[in-house]
Swiss-Prot record:
Keyword Metal-binding appears in the UniProt entry: yes
Cofactor: Mg(2+); [4Fe-4S] cluster
Residue numbers covered by motif PP-loop motif: 37-42
Domain of life: Bacteria
Pathway(s) annotated for this protein in UniProt: tRNA modification
Protein name per its UniProtKB record: tRNA-cytidine(32) 2-sulfurtransferase
General function of this protein: Catalyzes the ATP-dependent 2-thiolation of cytidine in position 32 of tRNA, to form 2-thiocytidine (s(2)C32). The sulfur atoms are provided by the cysteine/cysteine desulfurase (IscS) system.
EC numbers on record: 2.8.1.-
Protein family membership: Belongs to the TtcA family.
Cofactor binding: number and manner: Binds 1 [4Fe-4S] cluster per subunit. The cluster is chelated by three Cys residues, the fourth Fe has a free coordination site that may bind a sulfur atom transferred from the persulfide of IscS.
Protein source organism: Citrifermentans bemidjiense (strain ATCC BAA-1014 / DSM 16622 / JCM 12645 / Bem) (Geobacter bemidjiensis)
Keyword Isomerase: no
Additional free-text comment from the UniProt record: The thiolation reaction likely consists of two steps: a first activation step by ATP to form an adenylated intermediate of the target base of tRNA, and a second nucleophilic substitution step of the sulfur (S) atom supplied by the hydrosulfide attached to the Fe-S cluster.
Record HAMAP family: TtcA (MF_01850)
Length: 255
C-alpha cells in the first residue's frame, strides 16, 4: 500500500529533506542501515527515506534492520511482513539481549540503558556486515529537546544529540533524519498510514524512564504558555555562544 500523500506527508518529507540537506546526512553512493523497531518513528523514518531515495538527485541504498531483543511476545513477524510487502531490503536479527540484561542488571535499575547499548552494538555490527556506511536512527525533534533537558536537570551537562556523528566504532556514521519532525506530526501520520506498530514488549516498558516522562510533562506545561517553546529550544542547540558559558575549555585562549 502506498503512503497517503496528504499535507502531513508533505510536511514531514520537507522536514526530513531539510535535515538531510543542512547536516549533509546522506551523500551520493551511501548505503544506509535503517533501524526499524516496529514503532511509529522508525516506520515514518524508513518510508520517508525511501520516498526521498526515489526522488532525490543523489543515489543511495537502504537496508532495514530489525533487532529482536528476545522479550516475550515481541511480534517481529508483523514487522517483517510490512517490510516484505513494501519491497524493502531488510534483515531480521534475533538476539539474547533480554537474557543478558536479566543477568547483568542491578536491582531496581532500568532495562533501557543496557538494552540500548546492546542494540546499538548489534546495529553497528550488522551495518558493517551489510556494507552500510551510515546508520539511521528514528529520534525525532522531541527526543532531542527532552535529552537536552534531561542532561541539564539530572546530569549537569549541556548536551543533547547530534544529527550526524561518527560512532564509537570509528566506522559507522549515525544519522538522525527526524531531527526537525515533531512527535505530534508523526502520531497521526503513522495512524493514517496504518503502520503495524509493534510494542517492544519489555516487561518494564512505560514505567522505567520516569525522568523523560517528567520532561515531557514539563514541556507540555510550557507549551500552554508559549506554543513555540520546543522550536526555540531546538534552535538554541544551533545558536551557541561559548563566551557566555562556564566551561573553561570553550573559552581558554590558545597558547
Amino acid at each position: 500500500m502506498a503512503l497517503i500523500e496528504d499535507a502531513a506527508f508533505t510536511r514531514i518529507k520537507n522536514r526530513v529533506g531539510k535535515a538531510i540537506a543542512e547536516f549533509d546526512l546522506i551523500s551520493e553512493g551511501d548505503r544506509v542501515a535503517v533501524a526499524v523497531s516496529g514503532g511509529k518513528d522508525s516506520y515514518t523514518m524508513l518510508h520517508m527515506l525511501e520516498t526521498l531515495r526515489r526522488r532525490a538527485p543523489v543515489r543511495y541504498e537502504l537496508v532495514a534492520i530489525n533487532i529482536d531483543s528476545g522479550y516475550r511476545g515481541y511480534r517481529a513477524d508483523i514487522i517483517e511482513e510490512h517490510l516484505r510487502e513494501h519491497g524493502f531490503t531488510y534483515h531480521m536479527e534475533k538476539t539474547d539481549h533480554y537474557d543478558i540484561i536479566s543477568e547483568k542488571r542491578r536491582p531496581n535499575s532500568s532495562y533501557c540503558s543496557i538494552c540500548a547499548r546492546l542494540k546499538r552494538g548489534t546495529l553497528y555490527t550488522l551495518a558493517q556486515q551489510y556494507g552500510c556506511n551510515k546508520l539511521a536512527l528514528g529520534h525525532h525533534m522531541d527526543d532531542f529537546i527532552e535529552t537536552l533537558l534531561l542532561n541539564q536537570f539530572f546530569v549537569g551537562s549541556l548536551k543533547a544529540m547530534a544529527p550526524s556523528m561518527l560512532a564509537d566504532n570509528g566506522v559507522t556514521t549515525v544519522i538522525r533524519p527526524l531531527v526537525y519532525v515533531p512527535e505530534k506530526e508523526i502520531i497521526p501520520f503513522s495512524r493514517n498510514n496504518r503502520f503495524p506498530v509493534v510494542c517492544c514488549c519489555c516487561p518494564v516498558c512505560g514505567t522505567a524512564d520516569l525522568q523523560r516522562k517528567k520532561m515531557k510533562e514539563l514541556l507540555e506545561t510550557l507549551e500552554r504558555d508559549n506554543p513555540l517553546v520546543k522550536k526555540s529550544l531546538l534552535t538554541a542547540l544551533s545558536n551557541v555562544h561559548p563566551r557566555h558559558l562556564l566551561d573553561k575549555g570553550l573559552t581558554r585562549k590558545p597558547s
